[in-house]
């Protein structure tokens, strides 16, 4: 390299304070050092307080959510217990209703059977009564048909007299 070129071009330090802006930089740095901490400190303090407040609020919400979750779990277990109790009760009730229905059906079938037997015996009794009535009517008709041939005048008078005497005695 060419060192003579460097020496002639003026490479070096400039100690003129006004040309180098060292005073300007010193004022700016001093101002920043003096005023920035209070201004920035207030902003940072407000931001810190805001963050702490938000953290406390988040912790409170977490606590409330945890408590609500615990309550919901208790309510759920209580509801499940109640549902299983209701299910067991309904099964018992349906079983008793089924048994009662079966009992009523059996009783109704027995009543219908008894009624049928009763109807059958009353029908038989009615048929027997009808047959007796027809037999009596037929016997009376036969007797009346054969009576004029078998009775003469004196026998008829004796029969009438005897019937009148029987009526008077009673």
Swiss-Prot record:
<feature type="region of interest" description="Disordered">
    <location>
        <begin position="72"/>
        <end position="98"/>
    </location>
</feature>
<dbReference type="InterPro" id="IPR002146">
    <property type="entry name" value="ATP_synth_b/b'su_bac/chlpt"/>
</dbReference>
<dbReference type="GO" id="GO:0046933">
    <property type="term" value="F:proton-transporting ATP synthase activity, rotational mechanism"/>
</dbReference>
<keyword id="KW-0138">CF(0)</keyword>
<comment type="similarity">
    <text>Belongs to the ATPase B chain family.</text>
</comment>
<protein>
    <recommendedName>
        <fullName>ATP synthase subunit b</fullName>
    </recommendedName>
</protein>
<dbReference type="Pfam" id="PF00430">
    <property type="entry name" value="ATP-synt_B"/>
</dbReference>
<comment type="subunit">
    <text>F-type ATPases have 2 components, F(1) - the catalytic core - and F(0) - the membrane proton channel. F(1) has five subunits: alpha(3), beta(3), gamma(1), delta(1), epsilon(1). F(0) has four main subunits: a(1), b(1), b'(1) and c(10-14). The alpha and beta chains form an alternating ring which encloses part of the gamma chain. F(1) is attached to F(0) by a central stalk formed by the gamma and epsilon chains, while a peripheral stalk is formed by the delta, b and b' chains.</text>
</comment>
<feature type="transmembrane region" description="Helical">
    <location>
        <begin position="15"/>
        <end position="37"/>
    </location>
</feature>
<dbReference type="GO" id="GO:0031676">
    <property type="term" value="C:plasma membrane-derived thylakoid membrane"/>
</dbReference>
<keyword id="KW-0472">Membrane</keyword>
<keyword id="KW-0813">Transport</keyword>
<comment type="function">
    <text>F(1)F(0) ATP synthase produces ATP from ADP in the presence of a proton or sodium gradient. F-type ATPases consist of two structural domains, F(1) containing the extramembraneous catalytic core and F(0) containing the membrane proton channel, linked together by a central stalk and a peripheral stalk. During catalysis, ATP synthesis in the catalytic domain of F(1) is coupled via a rotary mechanism of the central stalk subunits to proton translocation.</text>
</comment>
<keyword id="KW-1133">Transmembrane helix</keyword>
<comment type="function">
    <text>Component of the F(0) channel, it forms part of the peripheral stalk, linking F(1) to F(0).</text>
</comment>
<keyword id="KW-0793">Thylakoid</keyword>
<keyword id="KW-0066">ATP synthesis</keyword>
<keyword id="KW-0375">Hydrogen ion transport</keyword>
<keyword id="KW-0406">Ion transport</keyword>
<dbReference type="GO" id="GO:0045259">
    <property type="term" value="C:proton-transporting ATP synthase complex"/>
</dbReference>
<keyword id="KW-0812">Transmembrane</keyword>
